[in-house]
Design a protein with these regions (language model features):
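Sec/Tat-exported extracytoplasmic proteins
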Residues: 46-54, 58, 210-214, 218, ...
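Hydrophobic-cavity lipid-handling domains and compact docking modules
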Residues: 21-186
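Cleavable N-terminal signal peptides of Sec/SRP-targeted secreted and luminal proteins
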Residues: 3-22
């Protein structure tokens, strides 16, 4: 249930950087043109050429190292349904994101929309957590180290944007306005250290319960987590998109 931040960072890389002019980026990136009838395949090839460089990062593109991917903080507040809790995750580190497979890209240039399908074989996550609330009517409280392993992850994302004219330059820019994501995790294993003030009996029982019911828990938390990641994604991506005109990011 902690995978979305990692996934959307990679979606940002895919959609935001693969088509910047060569004079502004390293030569290993392929330029894609929006009038290319094979634009979707071009983007896929661009991503493949970028993949080896993601592990260590690309300073010239302001892409940080992605192995591990570091996310400073995520907060989740859920008050409706069978899960009612507040949780905070800090110092998040995720391994395995650069092993993603971009299965398909479908661009709709006229409507400023991109649809992506990805597959992630495995993600491993470590973070400091703080949680307090109830899960399926059972109380849960604790803070400490959270660890998670997620495998066979299928992701579908639809990123919606719009064009606007810069008041400073008069040039046309692009910004993300919304996105939809649906992900399916084949299997998950999570462990929260120091639950219930270190009571090993209660802690072991809760971790067993979470792993036995991880699909139910993930389904309940998913909307709140998606909203959180959506705002992070839009804020971060638009800071980057605002620097380049559309004709630079995706020339005709």
């Amino acid at each position: 249930m902690h995978i979305n931040a990692n996934i959307f960072t990679f979606l940002l890389i895919i959609t935001g950087f693969v088509a910047v002019k060569t004079r502004e980026i390293p030569p290993f990136l392929k330029i894609c043109h929006r009038n290319d009838p094979n634009l979707n395949e071009c983007i896929k090839r661009s991503v493949d050429s970028l993949r080896p460089y993601l592990k260590t990062g690309i300073p010239t593109l302001q892409i940080p190292p992605c192995e591990p991917l570091r996310v400073p903080r995520i907060e989740i507040s859920q008050s409706a349904g069978p899960i009612s809790l507040k949780s905070t995750y800090t110092d998040i580190e995720v391994q395995g994101g650069t092993s993603f497979i971009l299965k398909s890209v479908k661009t709709d240039i006229d409507n400023d929309r991109v649809k992506l399908k990805l597959y992630l074989p495995r993600l491993e996550m470590n973070a400091q957590y703080n949680v307090d609330g109830k899960i399926l009517m059972l109380p849960i409280t604790g803070n400490g180290l959270a660890r998670g392993n997620f495998t066979d992850i299928d992701v579908t994302a639809i990123i919606q944007g719009e064009r606007y004219q810069s008041r400073k330059t008069g040039e046309i820019h692009y910004r993300v306005t919304d996105f939809y994501v649906d992900f399916d995790v084949g299997h998950a294993n999570i462990h929260l250290d120091n639950l219930f003030n270190g009571d090993s009996t209660l802690s072991d029982a809760m971790n067993l319960f979470l792993n036995d019911n991880w699909k139910t828990v993930a389904a309940e938390i998913k909307p709140a987590l998606e909203n959180t990641v959506s705002e992070l994604f839009k804020t971060f991506s638009n800071k980057i998109y605002s620097k380049f005109p559309l004709d630079t990011l995706l020339p005709p």
